[in-house]
Each structure stands twice: as structure tokens, then as C-alpha cells.
Amino acid sequence: NHFDLAIVDPPYGIGAGKRVGTTYKEGVLRNKKGFGNTKLYTAKNWDNEVPTAEYWNELFRVSKNQIVWGGNYFTQYLPESRGWIYWDKKIINHQIDNYSDGELAWTSFDTVLRKVTYDWIGLGYCNSSEKGTRIHPTHKPIFLYEWILQKYAKPNDLILDTHLGSGSSRIAAYKGGFN
């Protein structure tokens, strides 16, 4: 239990890295008008499988509390919890049919379900103050991690992110004075 809080976003095993359709064309992400700046991504196999039981055992061994994005994909590895987080992306008029309206995060905290709302589309920023280029295919906004740290972490907590991705969690931790 070296880390006070693990905030992780492991691969969901849904093959997002090779999507073809509205957002991906032949394995390359297309920039769509109004969705902010997006980098082009080549199809990869990073999201074909979920982490093994060994990963989950180690995560629980090294951390006191956990927040797991996409927890709904890992129910076979996670204990029951009533303290889920629902991130409402405020997708207006469902502009992109193959993106969900929100995401779920399982938590180890014995608390009520919490909802955080932030304008966001997987392709980039939508009505967001967080301008810039998305640098990872499953990039989550810094604001989201700032909100999580304010609600679930204590000063001087040691934070773990096993799947750093774009580094949004690290930026939020740095800004909030967390290690």
C-alpha cells in the first residue's frame, strides 16, 4: 500500500485503436470541424485486451484506494462499490453516434455516486476552456483529474497512474501539489 490513490484508465478491450467508421478511416483519426485540434493516430493493438488478473492483484496490493476508468469493463476483477463516478461529456445533439454520452469510473470509496460534467468529445475539445491538441487517442481532460483529486485525494497523497496516456493525471497532480 505504498500509493494513497491509484487513478487508472487501462485498456477496455474494445479495440478502439482500430476503429473504422465515423471517427477512424483506415486506422487514422480524422479531424472534424468544430472538434478542436486532433493529432492523426495510426491504428494500434493497445486496446484489444483487458489487463490480466495479475495486474489487478498488483494494483490493489500497491495502492490504498483506487479509481478505475471504464470499471464497467472490468467487473470480474473489481469488488462491488456504490461510489462510482459518472462523467457526463455533454455531447450536444449526439454529434458523434459512436461515442458514449459519458464514462463510468469504479472507485474503492464507500460513498454515493458522483457526477462530473465537462464538455468533451473523444475527438477533442467541445466548448472547452482546455484548448490545445489532444495527444493520445483516449485523452481525458486535465479538469477531470483536477476534480477527482479535489474530491478523493488528501494533501500530500502519493498518486499512481499505471496507464499515463497523455499525462493529464500527472499535470493535474502537479498543479494540485500532489506527488
Question: What are these model-predicted stretches?
Answer:
Residues 1-8, 12-44, 60-179:
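Class I S-adenosyl-L-methionine
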